[in-house]
Every structure is written in C-alpha cells, then in structure tokens.
C-alpha cells in the first residue's frame, strides 16, 4: 500500500468516454478519500464527442493531518500536470494511449489502470483498408510508460457480471493498492 508524501497531494487522472461513469468513479474516489481522512477535490474537462476526446477527470487527495501541520488548507490543482500523476485510470485502450501521449503516465511514478477493450476511432473505421491501431503495440507502450500497469478487459468483466465499467475500475483501484486505504474502505 502506498503512503502519501506529506508535502504533495496524491494525484489521479481518469479518462473515460461518455456514459461510462467516469464522473461516478471520480466521486467514489473523493468519497473514499474524505472518509479516510483526506481533503479531496475533483474537476473535469469534457471531451467534444465520443471519439474526438474522452472526458478527463482529475482528483487530488491531501491528508487532513498534512494540511493541519502546514497550518493552512492545501491548494489543490485543477488539471493533471504531465509527469506528476500518481494514478491514471483509462476506461479504454486508445484513451490509455492518449494518456501516455500527453505525458500523464511516467515510469518513475504512475500506477496505470487500463481497460484493454477498444471502441474504434472514426479514423480507424473510415480507412480503406484495415485502419485499426495495433492494440498490442498500444499495450506495449503502456507497459513501457508506467511504473506499474494493471490491465484487463474491464468492459467484458462488467458485462459478464451485470455491472458497469466504473465499478470494475474502482475494484481494480482497490486491488492495485495504490492508495493508502484498506481494501474494506472501498466496499
């Protein structure tokens, strides 16, 4: 289980397409943190349309004891900063690739939780030949970029259990032990 630095917040970026419950997932993380003794903040930047950009959610957590030791309330960020994100959660493999491309995932810091399912981009669908991006190459890039990669087809797992992908991603976050909360706190 990771322990936070008393000088900096825990930073989490979530990339999810419309209807996948990214906002709900972010709210669950905020609720988890607040019940665990953290000051928590969530922001979001909506994508333009389903395959031209996911909605990006950003969550920062700061231990209440840390803010009291500093005698001031923490000032939390509004957007993820490349190279400074502790946990990145992507609901789809291409979104994971975009997180890597944006520099949100780094080998010295980031636990990367990725659903390997694909929703093909318009450019992949309209190509005269097979225009699909190689999923294996995307996953290899994710492995190289992250300190730790947790991956699997979480959309399929959600469907097979009658759940939703946001719940599976929350479970993956609990299982990854990337936050300083006990697994039972996630329940």
Where are these regions (language model features)?
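Active-site cofactor/cluster-binding pocket
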Residues: 1-187
């Amino acid at each position: 289980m990771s322990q936070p630095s008393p000088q900096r917040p825990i930073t989490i970026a979530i990339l999810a397409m419309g209807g996948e419950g990214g906002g709900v997932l972010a709210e669950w993380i905020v609720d988890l943190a607040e019940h665990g003794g953290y000051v928590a903040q969530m922001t979001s930047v909506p994508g333009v349309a389903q395959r031209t950009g996911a909605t990006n959610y950003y969550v920062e957590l700061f231990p209440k004891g840390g803010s009291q030791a500093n005698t001031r309330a923490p000032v939390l960020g509004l957007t993820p900063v490349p190279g400074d994100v502790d946990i990145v959660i992507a609901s789809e493999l291409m979104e994971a690739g975009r997180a890597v491309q944006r520099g949100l995932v780094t080998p010295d810091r980031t636990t990367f939780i990725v659903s390997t399912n694909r929703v093909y981009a318009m450019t992949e669908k309209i190509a005269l030949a097979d225009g699909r991006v190689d999923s294996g190459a995307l996953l290899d890039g994710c492995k190289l970029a992250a300190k730790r990669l947790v991956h699997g087809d979480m959309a399929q797992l959600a469907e097979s259990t009658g759940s939703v992908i946001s719940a599976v991603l929350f479970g993956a976050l609990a299982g990854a032990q990337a936050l300083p909360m006990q697994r039972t706190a996630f329940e």
